[in-house]
Amino acid sequence: MSSSELKNDRILRAFQRQPVDRTPVWMMRQAGRYLAEYREVRAQAGSFMGLCRSPELAARVTMQPLERYELDAAILFSDILTIPEAMGLGLNFVTGEGPVFEHRVKTAADIDRLPQPSAQKELRYVMDAVAACRKELNGQVPLIGFTGSPWTLATYMIEGGSSKTFAASKSLLFNEPEAAHRLMAKLADTVADYLNGQVEAGAQALMIFDTWGGALDPVRYREFSLAYMQRILEQLPREREGRRIPVTLFTKGGGQWLEDIADTGCDGVGLDWTTSLADARRRIGGRVALQGNLDPCMLHANPEVIRREVARCLEEFGHGPGHVFNLGHGIQPETPPENVDAMIRALHELSPAYHDATATSATS
């Protein structure tokens, strides 16, 4: 099998709104702590970043959910904070706190001193992990590469970690907008290089996680988040190995800006559970694919409830192509693995009725 041949291209077809035989599915954080086998490899690695920095181990955990479930894509096991870590901010993961940076970005001078790490140098370990994943997949399903959005990365760099209010980050936007624009531009160009490196290493689809875009007001969202995701898109290759490389933008809490997001020229728009699939399809479904949007907490319900919610999501989107089933955010560590199986089985059983029975999912 050649490196470009795929046994299952269902998700790539769905992102292009082409006919498929059933609704494709993958899950945000599908390789993670809810799986016992992941926890074993994580312990072997010694630390979270140790796991990310080992191409062999990263590829192993990337493959784990595909060994359990009939998924239509793999997503690289890594973290959105690899870029700020490579900028020298000193990333640590503290139990009960999450990511914490030793050095915060506090001033305009701090912004101007930040280096721009290269995909082929400081971040080479991520590219090696992508290549290792492609080799392990051997054409089974496509590999998704990803990054955080400039605004989301900036919040961690400015706050020094997670935040409930983003007060320091927003203060920069309000008080020093020129410095904020310099930071976003530096991050956008670094992200573009990072994603280009992932594509060169073998990623077949891309996703930009704008996790904290929904914390912004409409003016600042368009100016400091969306504009820089657009800047990234303009620097990305959109085809490789004879195939479209679909790019999905996901702004958590971004339902009010769907038209603006679709205007960027992305291929897919990620939805959280606060946005109706039916409403999103009515507004932008003629231009982009839609990804989502089961509430991750639903996977703590019993299998009958999960099946009912899968059916509701399918009914909301309706008949025809252009839907990639996913959660509305990352799967939670306490999720029972058997409930994931119940969700996927329900989707496989129920979704073919919404598609053309003559559609194919193999490489054409």
UniProtKB/Swiss-Prot annotation:
Biochemical pathway: Porphyrin-containing compound metabolism; protoporphyrin-IX biosynthesis; coproporphyrinogen-III from 5-aminolevulinate: step 4/4
Keyword Manganese: no
Enzyme Commission code(s) on record: 4.1.1.37
Residues of the site described as Transition state stabilizer: D79
Class of the enzyme per the UniProt entry, highest EC level: lyase
InterPro entries for the chain: UROD/MetE-like_sf, Uroporphyrinogen_deCO2ase_HemE, Uroporphyrinogen_deCOase
Cellular component, GO, one term: cytosol
Positions bound to substrate: R29, Q30, A31, G32, R33, D79, Y156, T211, H329
Disulfide bond positions: none
Gene Ontology BP term (one): protoporphyrinogen IX biosynthetic process from glutamate
Keywords: Cytoplasm, Decarboxylase, Lyase, Porphyrin biosynthesis
Its biological purpose: Catalyzes the decarboxylation of four acetate groups of uroporphyrinogen-III to yield coproporphyrinogen-III.
Family, as annotated: Belongs to the uroporphyrinogen decarboxylase family.
Protein name as it appears in the record: Uroporphyrinogen decarboxylase
Gene: hemE
